[in-house]
A protein has these predicted regions:
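Disordered, acidic Ser/Thr/Pro-rich linker "stalks" and the adjacent N-terminal cap
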Residues: 737-793, 799-805, 829, 833, ...
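Glycoside hydrolase catalytic-domain context in secreted enzymes
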Residues: 1-700, 712-719, 723
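Short strand-edge motifs at loop-to-beta-strand transitions and within beta-strands
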Residues: 678, 686-692, 781-785, 833-837
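Short coil-to-beta strand junction motifs in C2/discoidin
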Residues: 652-656, 709-711, 803-810
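Short beta-strand elements
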Residues: 726-738
């Protein structure tokens, strides 16, 4: 029930020794974390870790450790080797992907699935059976240090990509995917870490709508086998000791069947930081009773095992509870095959496949698809390699590798920097002038974010060198942003501006009058207002992985057309925070329209770049939206179709985004909710039709009784290139199923099989054989006819008496359960005589006529399969 941190973390030995048999923890180890992965011994290679590489030697060493637990312990239960893996498995060398924020900006489910598969496959080949990914935190505060680890701000997008990552990782149960950090972890007060990440700022409804949503879906749809409990409290109750969150919700409501591992030292934090337990023993008691299976810590496992034994002996923790906790762990170990195949046998395959060329191609694709073009004034990009004889490159991230080798992924792979990528791309004989220009941060940082210090002579000299290079070049590429110095765990910021002297460098280079392209390599959105106004071209690369330099150079010179879209919001200033997507109506604007001395505007409004935004070297046109059915019940999906055409001269990718809004609701809902997306590739002139399905869950709200419901009414559908660039829109209507009033006044038994949404007293008139009487209906209203058993209708005869000019209708069939499928759409023709409408027949229990536009009246209906 404990984790033992591996070599040079807590464990002192690389391979088993005779001393291991004397250790208290030998019979209680659930997992060994990060063993021999090289995290504590960065270097080329680490001198004191002979088992870090090659891959086969590493796998052999983990086999030997596993052999000890199987052959030398009382029960012979294999251990679960765990490791990090949000941008590739954290080994000395493995396939290196962009960080998770970059992967989010691909909007590519299939690609993320491949990343997950490679991460899990390489993890298992190296000997690991449990990988800590994906991250299901939802980005809400751009200052937060771990923003680089989220997929984005939309809970729907986090869920969709999290599902694919987890499914890929757990292919054939090659590893267990352990998601983190459960729950309400990513909205700390002020964006601060606070070590225990205490006091998240959100309402209960927001927790459910934003933060619980991805977990619920990923657990149900991907079946993740691991969950890491988070440090933080919510509403004063630490998640680590919460039976409500770890058992009632996680296991009871969501159906989680794996095991829960604590974040490192989270158990200790109950008494050392939260103050909700008196000591370690009480912390252990609270955690185990709440639902914790395995405790993770940077200390010896004895500190947990000893108080746990005391609590069991005292009867404070029943053996039935221990059995439950151990059963979960064993279930996961059985599922990943540890009892059948505990050793990695094919060591030659390990060397052949880990970080192989095929996997690196997937990583390069991910690096390319994560790029977002933020600005391209006058089509500065792409650069023409044939017209450039001199190019200047500067900036602290131009020749930097560290952003590709941060924690939670591969540690020592070869990295292609932006400078190297450019040098590899330009034609022979092209002069590439490089100078760094400035450091990532200055000597007074982070205080320099509050107080402006004058440039030192040395700083001015470095900027002057960059200016001289720019003056003699055709174009200058400035590579700025952040690194693990400014972003990462415990690296929250008080500003979103470019740190250090980076803006000074950029302004000086732009002042030369030569063309400038800004490349951003960073782990969070930045407030680059000056750059947006004065720099002609800006490309956001996030942390693009070890092949980021190649991907960026391909985009700069037109061998690749960037097509990523923002999954986050770029505020104009830190003073706007919280500023994110989705948002409630008018929640992110202030009053006042007139600027200046005589105006009434007191605050800057709007984002610098909104959620979903991103440019391309080509253009796209949207057309032909259709919604089917236009009238649905609360349990019925809606199909939305549209067409997108590449109207430019280059092939390119477009991320088509589907949003929905509940127009009238019992509680305030979000202005737009992302409910669908698709990344498509189009050649010049090519058109593709896209099909989206809006599921009932996408329309749900948490009502005043804290029940998830789909409320009847109109919903607005929006299809666009971003959350603020809506190209197409339409509506559909949800009607309440089961509330129709059955007709009881009819004179025939047949008429009792008819129900309607309105004008119940007139319903019998459609079956009375009299064309002078009619049932009248407006848009959204319908009449439903029950059919005889095993009916398979393919036609219905309708006599329309009156109609408005815009009257349209649908014929729908249902197999039961309230879901109806549209089989015919048409325009009402008021001839007052029966007209036969034919459609493709299928087995159905009910047939429905729905008025989808305007109003109309029906005088008679004939259905040969009508139930008697």
């Amino acid at each position: 029930m404990v984790t033992l941190y591996g070599y040079k973390r807590v464990l002192k030995d690389d391979l088993p020794t005779s001393d291991w048999k004397k250790q208290l923890w030998k019979d209680g180890i659930g997992a060994i974390d990060e063993h021999l992965n090289g995290f504590q011994q960065w270097g080329l290679p680490p001198s004191d870790n002979p088992y870090v590489w090659p891959a086969s030697r590493h796998a052999w060493a983990l086999n030997e450790v596993q052999r000890f637990f199987i052959e030398e312990t009382r029960l012979g239960i294999p251990t679960d080797f765990t490791n990090e893996g949000i941008r590739g498995v954290e080994s000395y060398i493995a396939t290196n992907f962009p960080t998770q924020l970059g992967l989010g900006h691909t909007w590519n489910r299939n690609l993320v699935h491949k990343v997950g598969y490679i991460t899990g496959r390489e993890g298992r080949l190296l000997g690991y059976t449990n990988v800590y990914a994906p991250i299901l935190d939802v980005g809400r505060d751009q200052r937060w240090g771990r923003y680089e680890e989220v997929y984005g701000e939309s809970p729907y997008l986090v869920a969709e990509l999290g599902i694919e990552m987890a499914k890929g990782m757990q292919t054939d149960h090659q590893v267990a995917a352990t998601s983190k950090h459960y729950i309400a972890y990513s909205n700390n007060k002020g964006g601060r870490e606070g070590m225990a990440r205490v006091d998240p700022q959100m309402s209960p409804r927001e927790v459910e709508m934003i933060h619980v949503y991805p977990w619920k879906r990923v657990i149900k749809e991907a079946g993740i086998l691991g969950v890491m409990s988070s440090y933080n409290d919510y509403d004063g109750f630490p998640i680590q000791s919460s039976y409500y969150w770890l058992t009632t919700r996680l296991r009871g409501e969501f159906g989680f069947r794996g095991y829960v591992v604590s974040d490192s030292d989270a158990v200790e934090y109950l008494f050392s930081k939260h103050g909700t337990a008196a000591d370690m023993k009480e912390s252990v008691l609270q955690s185990v009773l709440a639902g914790l299976n395995i405790r993770c810590t940077f200390r010896s496992p004895d500190s947990y095992v000893l108080p746990l034994r005391e609590l069991i002996a005292e009867g404070a923790i029943p053996m039935s509870t221990i059995d439950d906790r151990v059963r979960d762990i064993l279930r996961v170990k059985f599922l990943v095959g540890l009892f059948d195949h505990p050793y990695q046998i094919d060591l030659k395959e390990t060397d052949k496949e880990v970080n192989c060329a095929e996997n690196q191609q997937v990583a390069l694709q991910a690096s390319k698809e994560s790029l977002v073009l933020l600005k391209n004034q006058d089509a500065v990009l792409p650069l023409d390699v044939n017209k450039i004889s001199k190019i200047a490159v500067c900036g602290p991230n131009a020749d930097e590798e560290a952003y590709a080798l941060t924690h939670y992924g591969p540690l020592a792979v070869e990295v292609t920097t932006v400078l190297e990528g450019i040098r590899n791309k330009v034609k022979p004989g092209t002069n590439v002038f490089f100078t760094k220009g400035c450091d990532l941060v200055d000597a007074n940082w982070p205080e320099s974010e509050l107080i402006r210090y004058p440039l030192t002579a040395e700083e001015q000299s470095e900027i002057d060198k960059a200016v001289e290079n720019a003056k003699k070049s055709d174009v200058t590429v400035v590579v700025l942003g952040g690194s693990n110095r400014t972003c990462g765990e415990n690296k929250s910021r008080s500003s979103l501006d470019l740190p250090g002297r980076q803006l000074d460098l950029l302004q000086a280079v732009v002042a030369t009058g030569k063309p400038v392209v800004l490349i951003l390599i960073n782990g969070r959105p930045l407030s680059i207002n000056w750059a947006d106004k004065y720099v002609p071209a800006i490309l956001e690369a996030w942390y693009p992985g070890s092949q980021g330099g190649t991907a960026i150079a391909d985009a700069l010179f037109g061998d690749y057309n960037p097509g990523g879209k923002l999954t986050v919001t770029f505020p104009k200033t830190v003073g706007q925070i919280p500023f994110n997507f989705p948002t409630k109506p008018n929640a992110q604007v202030d009053g006042g329209r007139n600027k200046g001395l005589d105006g009434n505007m007191s605050r800057v409004n709007g984002p610098l770049y909104p959620f979903g935004y991103g440019l391309s070297y080509t253009t796209f046109e949207y057309s032909d939206i259709s919604i089917q059915p236009a009238i649905v019940t609360q349990v019925q999906p809606v199909t939305v179709r549209c067409k997108v055409t590449n109207t430019g001269k280059r092939a390119g990718d477009e991320v088509v985004q589907l949003y929905v809004r509940d127009i009238l609701s019992s509680v305030t809902t979000y202005e737009k909710n992302l409910v669908g997306f698709d990344r498509i590739h189009l050649n010049p002139g090519e058109t593709k039709e896209l099909t989206f399905t809006i599921e009932p869950r996408d329309l749900q709200l948490l009502n005043s009784d804290n029940h998830w419901v789909v409320e009847p009414g109109d919903f607005k559908v929006m299809v666009g290139a971003s959350s603020e660039d809506i190209r197409l829109n339409d509506r559909f209507t949800v009607v309440e199923y089961g509330k129709e009033q059955a007709v009881t006044s009819a004179t025939s038994q047949q008429q009792k099989s008819v129900i309607a949404s309105s004008s119940q007293e007139s319903v019998p008139l459609v079956l009375d054989g009299n064309l002078s009487t009619a049932w009248k209906a407006n848009k959204g209203e319908y009449i439903t006819f029950a059919l005889e058993n095993n009916a398979s209708p393919n036609s219905i005869a309708i006599a329309w008496k009156e109609k408005s000019k815009d009257a349209k209708f649908e014929i729908q069939l249902s197999g039961g359960g309230g879901q109806f499928l549209t089989v015919y759409e048409g325009t009402v023709e008021a001839t007052n005589e029966l007209k036969n409408y034919r459609f493709k027949g299928t087995t159905a229990s009910d047939i429905r006529i729905v008025i989808t536009s305007g109003n109309a009246s029906i005088s008679e209906v004939k259905i040969k399969e009508l139930k008697n």
